[in-house]
């Protein structure tokens, strides 16, 4: 089928009949006449042989990916079209969008066991797939790389107190730091995703189809299409210092992988250690860059252990209202009581951006999380030193979190040694005094069962 360049919203391409026809073709079997997806050979070192990811509405017969670009924001694209604000056939002008620095290629790009949740060629759309673009294919970047000036009050305070020393290149006298950053949308190669989670590809497809209420029927009807752009948040990479040093094991690399926590990261809630640990990592990243190395922070959109912010706040209420109040002893079980599971972040996919950057050795890992540590080293990346959050940075109400995590296996380092069962039982959180505010008091709520010692995982690391 020829590529349709018609941009008239009143044309047949945008008629009700054509939309229905498109829907039927998209979900039909691969044997349907006229359906001819561009082949994908995931892991091939030649981007043309590997093939471009095509997941747009303009060329459904050539689509080789399930889902849509922009993750959860694709729904807003639909709203923009429905409101008459966006022409559904609009093709982005990518002329001035190329990355501001070169990344790769690295051998890890060609190993599905190292990269299967992002497209390593996702930032090279105009470079690697110009021939397709010239033919009219609508190929969208899934990675964008730019520069930034980061202005954090913690860094300004660090300059004022002398913890950080401005150098005029990486850190300005104002406390602003200069870095590169890359935004990445998830692109899943389903066979490898299934392998990492210990299930069959068929079971993975069926589970996603079922738990999204049938949102993606092609997961069932198009087993020939192995690429899926899930409707989830992606990640942002921040790099301080020279990015070219990152693959060099002899040059210092400081790294933190951080999972989103809007309440703490943005608004400064003191119920967890997320923002102080993040800003501490940024300080250490700046210092490493000033020593000639590189500092790296990877920020994942995994709000509330990937359970979402509504669920997280329900858990907060459960923690504060349970019999005896908020306690480290029962910290983990509250999430399971509300959500049915303690954590859905599943760090098996987390190391992929590290391999995208060519990381093979991390000298300073700013995290106490065993889950993250194990996920990274299990892919072959060496970690020399694990850095705990300084005790003085732990907020008052976050003592419950840090105490529970260390007791149940969080890497304690030197600062948190000696947390035993007595300390666990003694550690209590702030009383929010809900009684009288909404008619619910502690005595009205059922008690939460005592925390089990099995299957304990951490919230944010």
Label each residue range with its predicted role.
Residues 1-461:
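Catalytic domains of riboflavin
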């Amino acid at each position: 089928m020829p590529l349709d360049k018609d941009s008239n919203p009143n044309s047949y391409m945008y008629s009700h009949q054509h939309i229905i026809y498109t829907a039927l073709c998209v979900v039909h079997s691969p044997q349907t006449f006229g359906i001819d997806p561009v082949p994908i050979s995931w892991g091939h070192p030649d981007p043309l042989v590997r093939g471009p990811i095509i997941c747009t509405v303009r060329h459904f017969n050539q689509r080789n990916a399930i889902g849509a670009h922009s993750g959860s924001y694709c729904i807003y694209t639909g709203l923009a079209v429905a409101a008459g604000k966006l022409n559904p056939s609009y093709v982005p002008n990518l002329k001035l969008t190329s990355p501001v620095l070169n990344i790769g290629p690295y051998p890890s790009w060609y190993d599905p066991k190292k990269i299967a949740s992002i497209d390593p060629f996702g930032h090279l759309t105009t470079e690697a797939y110009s021939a397709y673009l010239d033919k009219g294919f609508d190929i969208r970047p899934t990675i964008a790389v730019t520069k930034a000036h980061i202005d954090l009050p913690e860094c300004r305070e660090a300059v004022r107190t002398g913890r950080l020393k401005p150098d005029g290149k990486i850190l300005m006298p104002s406390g602003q730091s200069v870095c590169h950053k890359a935004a990445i949308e998830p692109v899943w190669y389903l066979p490898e995703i299934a392998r990492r989670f210990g299930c069959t590809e068929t079971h993975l497809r069926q589970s996603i189809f079922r738990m999204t209420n049938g949102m993606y029927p092609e997961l069932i009807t198009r087993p020939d299409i192995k690429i899926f752009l899930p409707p989830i948040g992606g990640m942002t990479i921040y790099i301080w210092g020279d990015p070219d040093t990152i693959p060099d094991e002899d040059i210092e690399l400081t790294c933190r992988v951080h999972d989103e926590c809007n309440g703490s990261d943005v608004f400064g809630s003191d119920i967890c250690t997320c923002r102080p640990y993040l800003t501490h990592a940024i300080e250490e990243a700046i210092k490493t860059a000033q020593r000639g190395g590189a500092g790296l922070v990877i920020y994942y959109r995994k709000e509330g252990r990937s359970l979402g912010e509504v669920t997280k706040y329900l858990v907060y209420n459960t923690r504060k209202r349970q019999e005896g109040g908020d306690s480290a002893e029962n910290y983990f079980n509250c999430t399971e009581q509300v959500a049915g599971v303690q954590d859905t972040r599943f760090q098996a996919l987390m190391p992929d951006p590290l391999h995208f950057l060519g990381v093979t050795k991390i000298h300073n890992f700013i995290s106490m999380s065993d889950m993250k540590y194990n996920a990274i080293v299990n892919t072959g990346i060496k970690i020399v030193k694990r850095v705990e959050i300084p005790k003085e940075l732990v907020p008052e109400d976050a003592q419950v979190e840090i105490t529970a995590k260390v007791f149940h296996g969080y890497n304690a380092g030197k600062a948190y040694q000696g947390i035993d069962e007595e300390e666990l039982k003694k550690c209590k959180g702030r009383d929010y005094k809900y009684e009288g505010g909404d008619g619910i008091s502690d005595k009205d709520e059922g008690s939460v069962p005592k925390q089990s010692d099995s299957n304990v995982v951490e919230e944010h690391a």
